[in-house]
Structure formats: C-alpha cells, structure tokens
Amino acid sequence: SGLLLATTSHISTDIASAPFLWAPPLIAYIATFIIVFAKRPLISPAMADKSLLFAVAAALLMLNVPVFNSQIVVLGLIIHIGALFLAALSLHGALVARRPAASGLTEFYLLMSLGGVLGSAFVALLAPVLFNDIHEYPLLLGAALLLSPRFLGKGVRLTLDRRTLTIGAGILLAIGAIWSTFALLRADTDGSMVTRRGFFGVVKVYSPAGKDLTLMQHGNTIHGAQIRSQTDRPTPLAY
C-alpha cells in the first residue's frame, strides 16, 4: 500500500496532472489481489518475481528522464504502474503462499490489513515530514525488490547463488551510479533556491541556468515566473 501511494504521488505530480490519474495504479494494485487469490492465477507471481529487477531498474531510470512530450508521459506511466503491478503481484503472491490453515486466517488477514495501514501511514504522514521530495518512492521500490521471494526465499536468509547475487548487485550499483550522476547534473543546472513539501505535493522555486528568471514549480507544472533583474518591481510572466 505504501508503494501504491508513492507511485500515485509521483505520477500525478512529476509526470502528468490529469483527472482520475490515481485510478490506474489502484486498479493495478487491486488486480494483484484478484490474481494471487484465484485458484488458477492468470499471471504467476513467480513470473512477476523474475521480471521485478528489470521493472525496478526501468522505474528508477525513468525518475531522471525529463517529461517533455506526450510519448514520455505515456512511457513513464506504463513503466511506473508496471513496476507497481509486478512488485505487488510478487509480494502478495508470497503472502498467499504462506497463508495458514483456516484456524489462523483471521490473524493472517488482520496482519495483512495492518501492514497496509502502516505502509499508507508512512507515505501519507511520515514521509512528508522526513523528505522534501517524493524520495519514499525509490526507497519503497528498492525495499520491494529486496523483500521479494527471489531475494529472500521462504525464510529471512538470502537464497541467491553467488553468480545471481553478483549480477543483481552489479545492476543495482549501475542504476545507482547513473541515477546519482543525473541527480548531480540536475542539482548543478536547475538553480534550486527553495523546495517545500506539503499536503498537495512538492513546490520548488529555482532559477534555470543561463536564464534571468525565477520560476515556481509544483511537480512538473510551472505556476509563475519573474525576471530577476527587475529588482524594483518584478514583472509576472506566467501562471
């Protein structure tokens, strides 16, 4: 549930602002419950488990791709919602595989619901206090990958062989290096002045490199612009 809220926050503020954009992630999330509790699942959680590493890698890389046309918007939505779907399918499948006998089902479903509440509370209440941007999204993507059955197996010990673990670690390190490089480049060029996060998302005031402008931006939407050189009476340029 935490990843559901984080994904919804990211796509509705940093990719596109559109009515009912919260619906596709919710549909994908609920669909995973329908699939894993079915007698004959349409998609095997094991298949989702095998694809999860690549889905998380694609989602992390998309975090630093600028949204400049409708094709990027559509691609971003597909990748982020797809990563949510595969992560939820893998982890929910692991829960169902550990479902106890009838005598323990009440406790099982109660704890599952409690986990959903705690995940939602972390994203909705705690993350806005801890982070000034939607940093919980990549953190929860990584957590979903590390908690997947492919990494943890049936117990808490890692069950990967050395070769698979090395390849996976190398891919994650490469993702981290590329992501960090893009983040540093953006930090050097975006001229960030103030970043604040509240109930309605992240608001940022910055000065683009090489331009005599100060911009106010919410998500990927620019809400105002002023010329910096007019110190006596800055002229509003846009809203």
Model-assigned labels for residue ranges:
Residues 1-239:
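Alpha-helical transmembrane segments of multi-pass membrane proteins
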